[in-house]
Swiss-Prot record:
Residues 1-85, 167-189 are annotated as: Disordered. Keywords: DNA-binding, Nucleus, Phosphoprotein, Repressor, Transcription, Transcription regulation. One of its GO terms (molecular function) is protein dimerization activity. It comes from Homo sapiens (Human). GO terms for cellular component: chromatin; nucleus. Forms homodimers or heterodimers with TCF3 gene products E12 and E47. These dimers bind to the E-box site, however, heterodimer with MYOD1 does not bind target DNA. The modification Phosphothreonine is found at residue 25. This is Class A basic helix-loop-helix protein 15.
Length: 189
């Protein structure tokens, strides 16, 4: 059987029964030195009886009466949950749209988010490599450093390579990596 571990009840300090003149009741008389227990030791009904007739339980002031703060807190939490649910729904829809665009063979198995992003990244790189290969081969006699697209691609590769510490010499490496990855998904690994 599981028991609750509760801390011991705090007791009010024992009050000194000897009162000095001027202490005690507002009119200066001494309080009743009867056997009344300290405030913390009285029973619940005794405390309720000792309370003034107009005095009720303490309530926190709220925006719309008692419990209003709690209601507004619950309402804010519900609204926050709904916003998060909508955000996740939009994100999942975007991933599904990306899965439909990326060519992969295994239609019976849904790609995970990380697989989808990795395939998309490598697919974009392979398409870029293909475009660069096609555009540079169709421009015979180009004496400059190459078309603007190819220059931009080389700059991006140098920046990315410097940040990551490794560069690929040829854009064909991206195509090879993408086709290898597609093959591994085809095999089911």
């Amino acid at each position: 059987m599981k028991t609750k571990n509760r801390p011991p009840r705090r007791r009010a300090p024992v009050q000194d029964t000897e009162a000095t003149p001027g202490e005690g009741t507002p009119d200066g008389s001494l309080p009743n030195p009867g056997p009344e227990p300290a405030k913390g030791l009285r029973s619940r009904p005794a405390r309720a009886a000792a309370r003034a007739p107009g005095e009720g339980r303490r309530r926190r002031p709220g925006p719309s009466g008692p419990g209003g703060r709690r209601d507004s807190s619950i309402q804010r939490r519900l609204e926050s949950n709904e916003r998060e649910r909508q955000r996740m729904h939009k994100l999942n829809n975007a991933f599904q749209a990306l899965r439909e665009v990326i060519p992969h063979v295994r239609a019976d198995k849904k790609l995970s988010k990380i697989e989808t992003l990795t395939l998309a990244k490598n697919y974009i790189k392979s398409l870029t490599a293909t475009i660069l290969t096609m555009s540079s081969s169709r421009l015979p006699g180009l004496e400059g450093p190459g078309p603007k697209l190819y220059q931009h691609y080389q700059q991006q590769q140098q920046v990315a390579g410097g940040a990551l510490g490794a560069t690929e010499a040829q854009p064909q490496g991206h195509l090879q990596r993408y086709s290898t990855q597609i093959h591994s998904f085809r095999e089911g690994t």
